[in-house]
Amino acid sequence: MELIEKHASFGGWQNVYRHYSQSLKCEMNVGVYLPPKAANEKLPVLYWLSGLTCNEQNFITKSGMQRYAAEHNIIVVAPDTSPRGSHVADADRYDLGQGAGFYLNATQAPWNEHYKMYDYIRNELPDLVMQHFPATTRKSISGHSMGGLGALVLALRNPDEYVSVSAFSPIVSPSQAPWGQQAFAAYLGENKDAWLDYDPVSLISQGQRVAEIMVDQGLSDDFYAEQLRTPNLEKICQEMNIKTLIRYHEGYDHSYYFVSSFIGEHIAYHANKLNMR
């Protein structure tokens, strides 16, 4: 991994690395925050998945998470949201193509050559983190919007691999929402059964489980009712007896003003779980 940015932050280092991804067949950037204690010992890892139009920069520059990661001794890994490059398929819209990988493995041309974000996040990136950084095997996952969707899907499909999961403003029923329907039709085709592998509410209804789910949702979020549908997640978790910590916040929208207001509580939540044995 090639170091392309290095910034001192709260006694640790906010770095950005570039590497060639075998899963995605392109160069990828990834942000890695190494807290002060990473200089002397191995630490657990929190993976953060960003939302539509984002890259690796949004979370590391806007959330203020470094203060809390340093306090709680957690490495934070923030990858890009899709494969990148002039040779990678794209669309002239913000919710499909580059910047909108949806953390799935595409099966339809032209997307299936590069869009394997599920494999990248689940397998390739953790292997690289273990190889290059002082990381323990204990990891958790979180994200925002499309990234909250990705975090929930990865945790629900791989409950033994992630200690905990949380999300800000996630797309919880993508097969029922315009963003998800349009992306899934392009990436996965018209067989809607394939869509359900990347739909958190559907996965839970099929019996997939995690110990607990933490979600924060702003009630002034323009996408709340049509795209996000947080109450659907709350309802299915109640029906399937999955413990939740779902909080609704008056006045907060879909932006990083919202994420930055509560990211400290999410990192503390994951730190508590990661440090339990």
Swiss-Prot record:
GO terms for molecular function: carboxylic ester hydrolase activity; S-formylglutathione hydrolase activity. InterPro entries: AB_hydrolase_fold (IPR029058), Esterase-like (IPR000801), S-formylglutathione_hydrol (IPR014186). Its EC number is 3.1.2.12. It holds the Pfam family Esterase. It catalyses: S-formylglutathione + H2O = formate + glutathione + H(+). One of its GO terms (biological process) is formaldehyde catabolic process. The keyword Hydrolase applies. GO terms for cellular component: cytosol. Keywords: Hydrolase, Serine esterase. The active site is at S145, D221, H254. The keyword Acetylation does not apply. Serine hydrolase involved in the detoxification of formaldehyde. Hydrolyzes S-formylglutathione to glutathione and formate. Belongs to the esterase D family. This is S-formylglutathione hydrolase FrmB. The gene is frmB.
